[in-house]
Design a protein with these regions (language model features):
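Conserved glycine-rich "GG(E/T)P / GGGxP" loop and the immediately following alpha-helix
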Residues: 181-201, 287-292
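Hydrophobic residues within beta-strands of alpha/beta enzymes
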Residues: 181-183, 214, 239-241, 308, ...
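Glycine-rich, proline-tolerant flexible connector loops at the mouths of alpha/beta enzymes
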Residues: 185-193, 247-254, 317-319
């Protein structure tokens, strides 16, 4: 990304972060054109995104605007299809460059490990790596799904598994001396177990070498209870599975996932008979309404979710779903208060919040102001 000298992205056009593109899978998956998707709302033409992501719909269903929408955002809040987009001032980011950043990058490279920070082009990469933290992504760099929001490359891993990866992850976590470790993965629908065996092995290898708190951010394993149980039995402290968006938008945003299936996964974690905390995340700015957000928060809480993140969706490239709205920080604060009132244990809600952002603080591994290293 380009940025001004104050290390922000103020007064610039929405970035095209499509430096690396996934393989063209158009031969096997026809292009989708969404005409309408439930109530409320209508569809607005947002143009054709083109290869190599032909499965991303051409239209995004927008709900009617309600009072308070983009409160305080002025002309920077709502984004109409095709218009010149300026990132609002609250979306400034820190560019990488500290010594800790360089050390983290070198250690991960030496152990041939991939981070979701890089693959998903997270806006917090500079901030987190400067703290000596990173979220390690296992099971390769190709995802068997093609969600309209995600920057991770889609592809066909063809069953490949690096069975030495758990050892390398364990050694890296120990070398980084982390208090809180986050492990995630691409979706691996090509594997019979969805990758759950590797998740469990990674947890065990970390336990051999470190007393760190372990958080895993997992796919839905296609709803297979045995695969989820395999991860639960490895006993991480936190299991995170992101609901991502409101139910109405799931067919567009997460076409290979299901809203009810994600809720059921969280319920199984909460009812597992362990002390594992269930965590989830929502990204906003895709056309959801406040009423839909309230329902989603209530659904998550009713299914045992204890920890929650809410952040702004940022379009990784022109081939991904467009941003409908840059949500003002005041609304993030309101959603945080609403979620806490529903009984969530801890909530991180803000424009630049992501699933693993300050995960140690959210899970209570450390208290605000304490020296912390989380991965």
């Amino acid at each position: 990304m380009s940025a001004s000298e104050d290390h922000g992205m103020s007064a610039s056009e929405e970035p095209d972060m499509s430096a690396s593109e996934g393989p063209d899978m158009s031969a096997s998956e026809p292009e989708t054109s969404l005409v309408s998707i439930g109530e409320p709302g209508s569809t607005h033409d947002v143009g054709v995104y083109g290869a190599p992501r032909p499965a991303v719909p051409e239209r995004v269903p927008l709900a009617p605007r309600t009072k308070g929408c983009a409160s305080g955002a002025g002309s920077l809040g709502a984004v109409e299809p095709g218009e010149f987009r300026r990132l609002p001032p609250w979306l400034k980011i820190q560019l990488p460059g500290s010594g800790e950043y360089a050390e983290t990058k070198a250690l991960l490279k030496a152990n041939r490990l991939v981070t979701v920070c890089e693959e998903a082009r997270c806006p917090n990469l500079g901030h987190c790596w400067a703290r000596g933290t990173a979220t390690i992504m296992i099971l390769g760099e190709l995802c068997t799904r093609r969600c309209g929001f995600c920057a991770v490359a889609p592809g066909r891993p063809n069953g490949h598994v690096d069975w030495d990866e758990p050892r390398r992850v364990g050694e890296t976590v120990a070398a980084m001396n982390l208090r809180h470790t986050v492990i995630t993965s691409v979706a691996r629908d090509d594997l019979k177990d969805g990758g759950s065996t590797i998740f469990a092995e990674v947890i065990r290898e970390i336990r051999k070498r470190s007393g760190t708190v372990i958080e895993v951010l997992i796919p839905d394993f296609r709803g297979h209870a045995d695969d989820l149980r395999r991860v639960i039995d490895a006993r991480p402290e936190v299991i995170n599975h992101n609901i991502e968006t409101v139910e109405r938008l799931h067919p567009v945003v997460r076409p290979s996932a299901r809203y009810d299936r994600s809720l059921e996964l969280l319920r199984r974690v909460a009812d597992s008979g362990t002390e594992i905390k269930a965590k989830s995340g929502i990204m906003v700015g895709l056309g959801e309404t406040d009423a839909e957000m309230t329902r989603t928060l209530a659904d998550l809480r009713a299914h045992g979710c204890q920890l929650l993140t809410i952040g702004q969706y940022l379009r990784p490239s022109k081939m991904h779903l467009p941003v409908v709205e840059y949500v003002h920080p005041d609304r993030f604060a309101a959603w945080r208060d609403e979620a806490l009132a529903m009984g969530f244990e801890s909530v991180a809600s803000g424009p630049l919040v992501r699933s693993s952002y300050h995960a140690d603080l959210l899970a209570g591994t450390v208290k605000p102001g304490e020296a912390s290293k989380a991965g």
